[in-house]
From Swiss-Prot:
It comes from Mus musculus (Mouse). This is C-X-C chemokine receptor type 5. It comes from the Eukaryota. GO terms for cellular component: external side of plasma membrane. The lineage of its organism: Eukaryota, Metazoa, Chordata, Craniata, Vertebrata. GO terms for biological process: B cell activation; immune response; leukocyte chemotaxis; lymph node development; positive regulation of cytokinesis. It is a multi-pass membrane protein. Glycans are attached at residues 28, 198.
């Protein structure tokens, strides 16, 4: 079929060459910013749509239930030992609070994936900011745990208990304040937007309608990469290499070796859950900066990868309680007593469900001095 080379609308006739020139003018204009990703929004295809509409509600609901119950149990058990808990357990208490914040935003993520964002700008800003606060606080708390273990084991720093607890509480307060400050760009610039194609659902996104907002978005992205992930992971890696090296030399202190294992495992789980998301987000940042060859196909693949990797990262909020349950002897003992007191389960049924509980608890719980002891 041969298409006409002109468009006749009443008394106005547009030549196709003139139309192309007008489009080129508007695409180069600074008054009407256009993003290439708007023209690639349909590349995702039905796979991502099905994932958001079918798999995401089921999976996120499961994560919500497990994360809610698990982290509340962690908080209850740690709160019962408030006056005797160690510095690591204090950091883990705040980590559980941060994970609960992440759990609370999961229903909003499910709703947005199914029907779009229909809850207004205020909740849009709040949910995106809570997501960022959770991540920053989690990574900074894990870095503090690594530094605390490094100072206690490698340099044998043992401060006076009251002064030490005060410094830990001040550190945790500073971490929450830092998480809030790092999330300020989201609080200021997040808004509900309608994608270019009218068939798409409204989304809660970081607004990039002008140059100032775009610069704020890139600043937030690089702060997320460097301050929220890269630097804390470097600190954790440096500290735990030193800790492991010292523990290998002190083979006569098996209890100390067991006590630090939970911190390394928690950090490893955090890295495994969030590193794929950060790698994909970093590639997306490079693609938006035109540092790599951009195409609709690449944008589509990155969009799918971001959604899948974000799901893995969000699943992290329900994994820490499981880790404490299956690895911490004292934690298992306290959990067993709590569930028995609540009438949820008795010691016999728990031992049948987890055969290794009774054996490990009898042999090691008497020597356990910390909830995070293995």
């Amino acid at each position: 079929m041969n298409y006409p080379l002109t468009l006749d609308m009443g008394s106005i006739t547009y030549n196709m060459d003139d139309l192309y020139k007008e489009l080129a003018f508007y695409s180069n204009s600074t008054e009407i910013p256009l993003q290439d990703s708007n023209f690639c929004s349909t590349v995702e295809g039905p796979l991502l749509t099905s994932f958001k509409a079918v798999f995401m509600p089921v999976a996120y609901s499961l994560i919500f239930l497990l994360g809610m119950m698990g982290n509340i149990l962690v908080l209850v058990i740690l709160e019962r030992h408030r006056h005797t808990r160690s510095s690591t357990e204090t950091f883990l208490f705040h980590l559980a609070v941060a994970d609960l914040l992440l759990v609370f935003i999961l229903p909003f993520a499910v709703a947005e994936g199914s029907v779009g964002w229909v809850l207004g700008t205020f909740l849009c800003k709040t949910v995106i900011a809570l997501h960022k606060i959770n991540f920053y606080c989690s990574s900074l708390l894990l870095a503090c745990i690594a530094v605390d273990r490094y100072l206690a084991i490698v340099h044998a720093v043992h401060a006076y208990r009251r002064r030490r607890l005060l410094s830990i509480h001040i550190t945790c307060t500073a971490i929450w304040l830092a998480g809030f400050l790092f999330a300020l760009p989201e609080l200021l610039f997040a808004k509900v937007g309608q994608p270019h194609n009218n068939d798409s659902l409204p989304q809660c996104t970081f607004s990039q309608e002008n140059e100032a907002e775009t610069r704020a978005w890139f600043t937030s992205r690089f702060l997320y990469h460097i301050g929220g992930f890269l630097l804390p992971m470097l600190v954790m890696g440096w500290c735990y290499v030193g800790v492991v090296h010292r523990l290998l030399q002190a083979q006569r202190r098996p209890q100390r070796q067991k006590a630090v294992r939970v911190a390394i495992l928690v950090t490893s789980i955090f890295f495994l859950c969030w590193s794929p998301y950060h790698i994909v987000i970093f590639l997306d940042t490079l693609e938006r900066l035109k540092a790599v060859n951009s195409s609709c196909e690449l944008s589509g693949y990155l969009s799918v990868a971001i959604t899948l990797c974000e799901f893995l990262g969000l699943a992290h909020c329900c994994l820490n309680p499981m880790l404490y349950t299956f690895a911490g002897v004292k934690f298992r003992s306290d959990l067993s007593r709590l569930l028995t007191k609540l009438g949820c389960a008795g010691p016999a049924s728990l031992c049948q469900l987890f055969p290794n509980w009774r054996k490990s608890s009898l042999s090691e719980s008497e020597n356990a001095t910390s909830l995070t002891t293995f």
